[in-house]
Amino acid sequence: MVTDRRGFLKSTMAGALAATAAAGVRAAHAQGAKIKPGGRDVLLVVDVQNDFIPGGALAVKEGDAIVPLVNQLAAGFEHVILTQDWHTPGHISFASAHPGKKPFETITLGYGTQVLWPDHCVQGTPGADLHKDLKIPHGELIIRKGYRKQMDSYSAFFEADGKTTTGLSGYVKDRGFRQVYLVGLATDFCVCWSALDARKVGLVASVIEDACRGIDTNGSLGKAWEQMTKAGVKRIRSADIAV
């Protein structure tokens, strides 16, 4: 028996709207039509920061090549949210914080397996800044993640324990967004985790493949696409978007 009719109706309507959004994406692909972002769609620009660009501390190959395309796509969206890796000095994810360990080795922490990274995106440093050529003046929100010293964060929605929220899930719910399109760095880590968690909180999620770049360490890129496909994340191209 339903005791909270208002909550039940709200949940039912949200599910129906999400299903409608997903159907719209499928129909656009089936008909070869371009996807026109609407008022319930949001572009999520993930970690386009100096330390992830060639020459940075944790450079993603060709990471800078996506910047013009991200700008072009952002111009076609009414709503844009950006994320920013924002680590403390001596962060638990840094290899330098673990004597004898090297970057890209793994350790086990309370929340699971942790890849150890070179020091990167340290709060207040130039490496943590968004790329200078990123031009998104209408960006509505910047989500900073990874600022808890004892926990890493890849996802824009949750920290690495999968429970501690960044606040983004509440924000998108309050704003009434139903569908998120993801671009940025890196495909197989922060973009992937964000896309999976977008599905977890009930959003339709599409990754714009050519507006992302991956690290692909030990086959991580292929594994990420497998995970995303299994979770119902759409894999699309910038040419699919009407901008």
Where are these regions (language model features)?
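N-terminal secretory signal peptides and thylakoid transit peptides that target proteins
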Residues: 1-16
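C-terminal segment of classical bacterial N-terminal signal peptides
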Residues: 22-26
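Active-site acidic carboxylates
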Residues: 31-147, 174, 178, 200-207, ...
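Short catalytic/ligand-binding loop motif for oxyanion handling, primarily in non-cytosolic enzymes
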Residues: 88-92, 151-152, 190-191
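Histidine/lysine/aspartate-rich catalytic loop segments that bind and position anionic ligands
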Residues: 137-166, 170-171
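Glycine-rich anion-binding loop/nest that anchors nucleotide
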Residues: 177-193, 207-213
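Histidine-anchored nucleotide/phosphate-binding helix
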Residues: 192-200
